[in-house]
């Protein structure tokens, strides 16, 4: 085919893709069912991971919860079991038929596994255990994350490595563990819970930003690889929220006059937006929508212009109060241990 004709056809496809994206933004697509599907969630013991578990439980997925903390993981599992019990009660919800929701003929279950996702041997062995005890995995939610809370020159090398391993490298291990069967079946969904700090950065959290940039790069490259393999049954969703009020960045502050218009996100809102994206096979979701604009402006504006905007918003040193709190907390712990 003549290259000019092919270029013209490509431009038509690009325009059509833009039109369809706008159409989906205006008219909410129908959500797919995940009932009965096996869903692995890393970092399920609290924060967003726990909320993801509850949302998937309400949709009657079989949950496989991974966390390094056994007690927190079991707490999440009990919340999931309570949701299952409420759904099994025919009087708990009103439905369309006779005022009662019909209960599906299968009984979803929840399984818990304690492991460190930063240790690839542990990830691979636990994944094999999941396949034996639960079955093949349909959905993988790479959610586990940590933050060191130190300025670069004050951060121990071990904490930098830990941040990179958990926030980025673990995605490689979990994906390598579960993707082969997804490719074989041409069915599956991989979700990367990243951060807006993986799209644009700020001072004081170099290790965290690098880990999230890495996770996003991995996700995007993997998405292209799956597209190149023509496995259209495997979906990918990238979740990039603004700062979420889970306590991970407690103390982070932008300019006080701006903060009412851009407060930390409620975790419940963040997860509901992410669930909507996952269940409609949306490739990427940024919350709030202004994150899309900030990322676009970062791509086209000179660095000096970005610095001016950061200083106006108070985003250049927004992490400093958080870092100071973490340092004070560590000093207090060291003082207590020295008594």
From Swiss-Prot:
| Pathway named in the protein's UniProt entry | Cofactor metabolism; retinol metabolism
Enzyme Commission number(s) of this protein: 1.1.1.300
Superkingdom of origin: Eukaryota
Top-level EC class, please? oxidoreductase
Residues that hold substrate according to the record: 195
Q: Which Gene3D superfamilies match?
A: NAD(P)-binding Rossmann-like Domain (3.40.50.720)
Subcellular location(s) per record:
Microsome membrane; Endoplasmic reticulum membrane
**Major place of residence:** membrane
Q: What SUPFAM superfamilies is this protein classified in?
A: NAD(P)-binding Rossmann-fold domains (SSF51735)
- What residues bind NADP(+), as annotated? 40-64
Q: Where are the transmembrane segments?
A: 3-23
Q: Which residues form the active site?
A: 208 (proton acceptor)
| CDD domains in UniProt | 17beta-HSDXI-like_SDR_c
The family database entries (PROSITE patterns) matched by this protein are listed as: ADH_SHORT
A single BP term in Gene Ontology: retinoic acid biosynthetic process
GO molecular function annotation: all-trans-retinol dehydrogenase (NADP+) activity; oxidoreductase activity, acting on the CH-OH group of donors, NAD or NADP as acceptor
The family annotation for this protein states: Belongs to the short-chain dehydrogenases/reductases (SDR) family.
Please explain the role this protein plays, according to its UniProt record.
Retinol dehydrogenase with a clear preference for NADP. Converts all-trans-retinol to all-trans-retinal. Has no detectable activity towards 11-cis-retinol, 9-cis-retinol and 13-cis-retinol.
What name appears for this protein in its UniProt entry? Retinol dehydrogenase 10-A
